């Protein structure tokens, strides 16, 4: 049976930048009723007219304390089974997988909805698994994740298309690098890879110019928002949200067990009696004060730190976790420009140059609506990771002058690109574990066997191919860390 997610009830809309820009806007509580400081009473969704009820368990005006010391006993405590911190695509995938396996999951995110940061600011590409060292987590999860992702998209009618990719060498000096990519892809068991002479590639794509190309037929594109929305729907029994000041229910009546708490920031935590204690607050409440104040103490059996850009900063605020196990943070901003003044996309396939330092190069993608995007570039950002919320930390504006560097790079493989045809699109920040002139780092997934903290799983450096790998990462966490 096919399942198709409903999207009309949500205000997150295309184009992508309009949706992604929500990260810089004030929280809108009309979109979703936050459950911070409240206990959800689950009612059967078997009824034709399901009802809802909320039981207040904390009066924030009377029970707030500072930090995690002293009067911490005065705030409400809530024992929960599993907490997933971060409602990006990986966090959503983890929450879904754990809930499918019978765990009660609470998903916390500082934003007012899911997927507002890195997950909404990328190329929306399904990667085949070519670029990564054999036996690395990136290689393993990308290949497995691609299989799971295509299967999921087909089953639930998520818009996607396996359009293929050409990685191109535009000069003879780049051919050895292309050969290396072919070798890596073969080692990673990526099927269908084929080396093409320049004329063969240009026969496929007449606007292309190259001397050689690597064809990856398994690469593709998908609608990331529809995918994330589906993950949300597959994680919970029902969701309460506000629509014109009326409370409504939305979601499929499935027997999964997950609760979403948006506008919720994890201030800090500590290990006590082999349990992680988390101290949380309403994002808007905490950001309005110089010193953040906890409003609720959560005591979970399992914590998955999937906070993306904020994962390391959060880990450093968990007292009892040795900071030696927290890798350094590096942030790389990537800008995208859209192609204007065209009647039809110049390419049918994804076209990628030879990878550059810090990224895969300024490539061309065509989304499912026919919008042609070029990017991202790489701009290293000097930044510290000592803040509790990343909602307004980064500047996502695209400087139109950056297009001056795009034109010569793109014209290496697309010489007919016209002056003035690039318009600022959007930008994203990549959570990297390696900096400039350093070798690319692998994903880091840590459990108790690494850092010694019971019930804590840290996910660090989940950059590309994080979207493609999301379902495989979730599968791995469920298989390895569920007891």
Curated annotation (Swiss-Prot):
<dbReference type="GO" id="GO:0003973">
    <property type="term" value="F:(S)-2-hydroxy-acid oxidase activity"/>
</dbReference>
<keyword id="KW-0285">Flavoprotein</keyword>
<dbReference type="GO" id="GO:0047545">
    <property type="term" value="F:2-hydroxyglutarate dehydrogenase activity"/>
</dbReference>
<keyword id="KW-0496">Mitochondrion</keyword>
<dbReference type="GO" id="GO:0071949">
    <property type="term" value="F:FAD binding"/>
</dbReference>
<keyword id="KW-0560">Oxidoreductase</keyword>
<keyword id="KW-0809">Transit peptide</keyword>
<feature type="transit peptide" description="Mitochondrion">
    <location>
        <begin position="1"/>
        <end position="67"/>
    </location>
</feature>
<dbReference type="Pfam" id="PF01266">
    <property type="entry name" value="DAO"/>
</dbReference>
<comment type="function">
    <text>Catalyzes the oxidation of (S)-2-hydroxyglutarate to 2-oxoglutarate. Is specific for the (S) enantiomer and possesses very poor activity toward (R)-2-hydroxyglutarate. Has no activity toward related 2-hydroxy acids, such as glycolate, L-lactate or D-lactate.</text>
</comment>
<keyword id="KW-0274">FAD</keyword>
<dbReference type="InterPro" id="IPR036188">
    <property type="entry name" value="FAD/NAD-bd_sf"/>
</dbReference>
<dbReference type="InterPro" id="IPR006076">
    <property type="entry name" value="FAD-dep_OxRdtase"/>
</dbReference>
<dbReference type="GO" id="GO:0005739">
    <property type="term" value="C:mitochondrion"/>
</dbReference>
<comment type="similarity">
    <text>Belongs to the L2HGDH family.</text>
</comment>
<protein>
    <recommendedName>
        <fullName>L-2-hydroxyglutarate dehydrogenase, mitochondrial</fullName>
        <ecNumber>1.1.99.2</ecNumber>
    </recommendedName>
</protein>
